[in-house]
């Protein structure tokens, strides 16, 4: 890309703290994701359209998008087949990521219940027994640990089972379950659906685009109502179900005089121990000896959301702020587990004093100081990691340190249980507010950052438009962090809402945007939607609700979008998925699915137009329910 087309810091992000760090990076000659994006332009149009196939070694094959050249791959696969297969593989990868996260959480729970992981303990006993009851496990004449062992075995069976249903799907409305069964997309077992994705997309197996995509919906349901939901539930049992609390966000949470430890990734199994170790008197004494006034843990991405929701641990930023946190020059250790971690951090941390510490047996990166984390010695390993950060504090180069002042208060911790508790124990007050028109509907806005969209621009503007029009927003993941940075997660943000929503928020003392957790915690939104639908005796697809992922980028987001739509929620995507090379697949996703499962996708990069689509949909559902 020519120098004259290079984006300025202000064009890359709407967040002022990020703009400051982007300018610092440019001044210091430090490369960021935005620079690498510009180096990639123009991006491969075949890849963008989804019409390149590498599924066998006769290829790669690509289809002419204009219909003037090659119309089939060597095996005879058309654009429809190739696009559908590629999309299915994206769903498989996304579902695998969430579900493997869940597997590790359950295995940790199992080790804890067997006395093999002494650093962990049950923090929500009520949820333990509630979940056990759901799985048909009697607690009579059994110790808590015996119940936990049985529950762990039952949850693990959801991964390997060959016949369905996955038990958590029973939380969905009866009409939705019946529809899934009639369509043949009721998920049977988490691992089975993912394996079948890979089998179907092997050369010479499934070659009907609609048939392929229906299995994609089934696989995504094994994520949303399986892996993700199991992860959320068992993490609540282990670490506590979130309740409303206050904290702070953005790069300004980093400290000038404390040891800064960033936890980044997605699994709270590690970060819970890091938070605990940072309060260890021995390590605090060592920090003082090294010249620091304490130890400051801050999060990035969903590991950050997990500790934020349960402990009020501050968050330094979103996916696209991970490099910027290091560029402050004030981070002693960047501690990572899995998912959404840029391999660029290896080279970047080498430009500063920051230790880049990888901990997962599944994920290593260039330039890391590897400190593999195992549940059996969880706290001891966490102490070693924090100790390494503390000992690195004297190496901080003050000439390179520049921490933006920007930080914003936020109110978080709105699990489904916390929301229902705030409503008096049932969704009835929420339903009354919707029926009366004070709240027009619910907007679920989630997802990643993407350098193709100005950082946080899509997230913040879409959400502002929704609340202005009396739509209560529930949020997770990087959208939640972006909204927090923009000051939308405080009760005072009700001033930006329409009069109806404003009145509800002021009466309850809540923000107009409710932080429900990490990306796996979108399952909390499904639970809440089901509770409302069941109270009304309708399907989720009948509710005045809509979803959006304004800046999505990961394969996990593809799986999320598929299971949200499969659950009956119209969903707007802010970046274009690689499907436009097939008119048939595009038409099915944006129109055809509505007649099949009661919801569909729309693609709209402009957040204001995306909000209009969601508001139009919500208004249509209100009219269908007889609401004004």
UniProtKB/Swiss-Prot annotation:
Its EC number is 1.2.7.4. [4Fe-4S] cluster 1 binds at residues 44, 52. The keyword 4Fe-4S applies. It catalyses: CO + 2 oxidized [2Fe-2S]-[ferredoxin] + H2O = 2 reduced [2Fe-2S]-[ferredoxin] + CO2 + 2 H(+). Its cofactor is [4Fe-4S] cluster; [Ni-4Fe-5S] cluster. [4Fe-4S] cluster 2 binds at residues 53, 56, 61, 75. Cluster B is an all-cysteinyl-liganded 4Fe-4S cluster; cluster C is a mixed Ni-Fe-S cluster which is the active site of CO oxidation. Cluster D is also an all-cysteinyl-liganded 4Fe-4S cluster that bridges the two subunits of the CODH dimer. This is Carbon monoxide dehydrogenase 1.
